[in-house]
Curated annotation (Swiss-Prot):
One of its GO terms (molecular function) is transferase activity. Belongs to the universal ribosomal protein uL2 family. One of the primary rRNA binding proteins. Required for association of the 30S and 50S subunits to form the 70S ribosome, for tRNA binding and peptide bond formation. It has been suggested to have peptidyltransferase activity; this is somewhat controversial. Makes several contacts with the 16S rRNA in the 70S ribosome. It comes from Chloroherpeton thalassium (strain ATCC 35110 / GB-78). Residues 257-280 have a biased composition (Basic residues). It holds the Pfam family Ribosomal_L2_C. PANTHER family: LARGE RIBOSOMAL SUBUNIT PROTEIN UL2M, RIBOSOMAL PROTEIN L2. Residues 32-54, 221-280 are annotated as: Disordered. This is Large ribosomal subunit protein uL2. HAMAP family: Ribosomal_uL2_B. Residues 232-242 have a biased composition (Gly residues).
Length: 280
């Protein structure tokens, strides 16, 4: 998927780049797999902001995606490859031999007319989903389950994948996109291949308005606020912690910039062999 760059005829097109969409085969989604998607604006049921910097944006329908890939032994043909406004990856519409239609995350290299299947007996082929115990070591996988039968939860965004580095006993070891080494039960399913839309990370929105179209509101630095609005607000000049306080904090008073926020007693911590690589 090449990235297209416009000539800087206006300030909004000077830094703007967008995908070519050449892999998209239709602009009409499957109606039976669409559900309304009401925007919350970052508010909970009490009307209070629980997720900042959210609101506005274009209306969207949610596409029901098959993350479980549980139609074992039934072959399917790729009918279309479509754009999904709710995620960075493209989606593929599968038409199964029994007549059912389902959306899946479109792997890189998949084409209309390709045959795809899932289950323990499936071939090691891009787009096929099978348990980790049936996948050879060294294969790149995506849409990985954390618990058997729960559906894929890891490596689902554009261009992401994990590498199966080892299998020992009841667990398989995966190198995640973050660099983390993590154990997962060998009964968990994963899909072979890399998620498509690889050039997504090279795109530039070009102007603030395009960010608003996506439902993303502006972010204001805590240092630029007043003390009543943020723990890091106030002070004379650019005081890092605001008004002489010792450590930078989040808007709710939790220490930020260096503090580990993962729960110490989380059960799945024992499955992490090595923490993710630090971003330097």
């Amino acid at each position: 998927m090449p990235v297209r760059i416009l000539k800087p005829r206006t300030p909004g097109t000077r830094f703007f780049s967008y995908p070519s969409f050449e892999e998209i085969t239709t602009d009409k989604p499957e109606k039976s797999l669409l559900v309304p998607n009401k925007s919350t604006g970052g508010r909970n049921n009490n009307g209070r902001v629980t997720s900042r910097h959210m609101g506005g944006g274009h209306k969207r329908y949610y596409r029901i995606i098959d993350f479980k890939r549980n139609k074992d032994g039934i072959p399917a043909k790729v009918a279309t490859i479509e754009y999904d406004p709710n995620r960075t990856a493209r989606i593929a519409l599968l038409s199964y031999a029994d007549g059912e239609k389902r959306y899946i995350l479109a792997p890189n290299g998949i084409k209309v007319g390709d045959l795809i299947e899932c289950g323990p007996e499936a071939d090691i082929k891009v787009g096929n989903a099978l348990p980790l115990k049936n996948i050879p070591v060294g294969i790149e996988v995506h849409n990985i389950e954390m618990r058997p039968g729960k559906g894929g939860q890891m490596a689902r965004s554009a261009g992401s994948y994990a590498v199966l580095v080892a299998k020992e006993g009841d667990y398989a070891t995966l190198k995640m996109p973050s660099g983390e080494l993590r154990k997962v039960r060998v009964e968990c399913k994963a899909t072979v291949g890399v998620i498509g839309n690889l050039e997504h990370e090279n795109l530039s929105l070009g102007k603030a308005g395009r960010s608003r179209w996506l439902g993303i509101r502006p972010q204001t630095r805590g240092m630029a606020m007043n003390p009543v609005d943020h723990p890091m607000g106030g002070g004379e000049g650019k005081s890092k912690s605001g008004g002489g306080r010792k450590h930078p904090k989040s808007p709710w008073g939790q220490k930020s910039k260096g503090l580990k926020t993962r729960k110490r007693k989380k059960a799945s911590s024992k499955l992490i062999v090595r923490r993710r690589d630090s971003k330097k």
